[in-house]
Amino acid sequence: MSAYADTSFLVSLYVLDGNSARAAARMKSVALPLSLSPLGEVEIANAFQLRLFRKELDRSQIKAAQKLFREDLANGIIVLRPLPPAAFDVARRLAEKHTRRLGTRSLDVLHVACALVLRATTFYTFDEKQRKLAKAEGLRVP
């Protein structure tokens, strides 16, 4: 079994928020490593900086979160997988098939497309629209 994690799930592992306890609990049963696309890596960096901008965290908390994330990458808990070119074709198909019904955003369909192209069987997210899309495409969403 392989797993793909989106930004909402991963950020909750590194920054205390309303989903942190759920993320930590789910990590106990995750089949490692978690796959992450370069898109997710950019989103995580941006999410950390948004917390600073919104004054939800200070610089030292951001640095600590970044350090933990880098350690998980270095230790193979999270593996950065190249964004396959086919992901864009799959994302376009997902948008045409599901967006009118689910209201998914571009990045939602791209994350799910990445998971599908990378042959993930499980998709970790706290985003409700991504959850519905991933389930509609046959991914397991705990």
Predicted feature locations:
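Short, well-structured N-terminal submotif of metal-dependent ribonuclease cores
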Residues: 1-43, 47, 51-64, 137-140
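Active-site neighborhoods of divalent-metal-dependent phosphate/nucleic-acid chemistry enzymes
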Residues: 77-128, 132
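Generic secondary-structure boundary/loop-capping signal
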Residues: 7, 11, 36, 75-80, ...
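A local structural micro-motif
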Residues: 35, 81, 123, 140-142
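A generic local structural motif
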Residues: 20-22, 67, 109-112
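Active-site-proximal, substrate-binding regions of enzyme catalytic domains
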Residues: 39, 45-94
